Amino acid sequence: MTRITLSRLPGDRLRVRDRDTELALATGDLPAYVQAREADRPRWVWDDTARWYPSLLTAGVRVERCHDLRLGRHLVRRAPAADPRLLEGEESEHWDRLRPSAPSDPALFSVDDRVEFLDAEREDARQLAAVAASNEAPRLGLLLAAESAGALAAAEMTHAGVPWRVDVHERLLTDLLGPRPPRGARPQGLEALAAEVRQAFGIPALNPDSRPELLAALRRAGLDATDTRASTLRRLEHPGIVPLLRYKQLAHLFQTNGWAWADQWVSGGRFRPSYQPAGSSTGRWSSNGGGALSFPVQVRPAAVADEGWVFVVADVAQLEPRVLAGMSGDRALARSAQGADLYQGMVDDGAVATRNDAKLGLLGAMYGATSGESGRMVAGLTRRYPQAFGLVEEAARAGERGQVVRTLLGRGSPGLGEDWGLDAEGRPADPDAQARRRRSYGRFTRNFVVQGTGAEWALCWIADLRNRLWRLHDVGPLDSRPHLVFFLHDEVVVHTPAALADASAAQIGEAATAAGSLLFRELSIDFPLNISIVRSYADAGKPGAAVEDQ
């Protein structure tokens, strides 16, 4: 496959290296060049997808493949199967300085900053050499390709945006909170609830947004509260608790998805969040702004497909337990995972008496339950599924020894650090503190291997799906065809012409099957999907909306 590297040059120009050919282009000429070369299906190599791809999309140019050097360097440097010394060399310290960028950033670096003009070809050669020298080169290569494809999908989703009815959103806010308040003031609905809370606790000046004041009020009322989380408040009995919980719920809506949020993140009838691929250590995505990974049910009615279009919403049932079966090679658990409900499959196979027992045991194994009903279930199921439960147990023990663990494709966990045995002042920590830190890191590594591999499956899913959707309709730019508009760990939302809804749903299912086959070649693992075709995102999963379980 042809690799074409792109590097920025001073003077609003860039250098293109295509095999043995090198040429300089004006930045404004790049879209036409990329469009012409896409027919050859090259892999575009650049420092950061979020810095290169948005302008191409704006020009109507979509690319199939890329290699994101920033993401790749971070991945290879931490991969246990790769030698990080192979990444050293000229400009390596500047590559280490690269940080995630958002499409809205006007300029991350000054024009004389070395990080602005890095040599993509040199860094690409280093990363390719590090992968080639690894004893797990095929897996690492797949992970690098999937990670970069995810970056393309993220940029495309921000570009296309989630169709958004501003009038519906404003009506929801007004119904729940009252009219839009002046800047810095509470809405009428919140102010009324605050007055109820003050009256119930007998403190006229109480600020329910202040955690210290709220804790003091709770204790003054004789309530045993150590924090003000909703889960803690629900356990307390007092006339002020109900209005306080309602206040906290609506205050969160006002702060995170209120009028100011819409002003910043909704434009042209589209909600355009900024995703950060591999934003967490496990490879899961995070948000660079807009709350892309936090989409409250209260505002979902405002996400309405365009006229003549629909949403196809699909989520994976029990992703991480199925991933555990696949990565461990546990055929007994894989048999239980056949069909729509893995937990019920465990019951049907005679592993446990009830579905709740199955859920307690599997989640307990992945999160380290050692006591209570969950701990008892873990002990029993370990004998039934020794490979699956043994994998997470060994990951936990490795973490407790201070060792790094890895996902199926080779993403490495962050290390405990050489100073794990020291306290904050650099002195040897006491044995109890060391043991607590080891156990805490062991709980992290136990979950890391499964959650990280689940993220790899999801990357392979959307990497394949974005190309399948593109091929469903062979005319027009990205947003005139079926396309991804939202992704959340184990859920995708596709915006598609209604006439292509069934075809889009079929492609979502086929991409899920292909991702499972790609990762777990020797073991057949089902990844059933709950699929809905709806006009409003709020209707997904409701009776009458589901097409079928695939």
Predicted regions and their residues:
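Function-dense linear segments that define catalytic or interfacial modules
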Residues: 96-97, 119, 274-353
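Conserved catalytic core of nucleic-acid polymerases
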Residues: 159, 348-487, 493, 498, ...
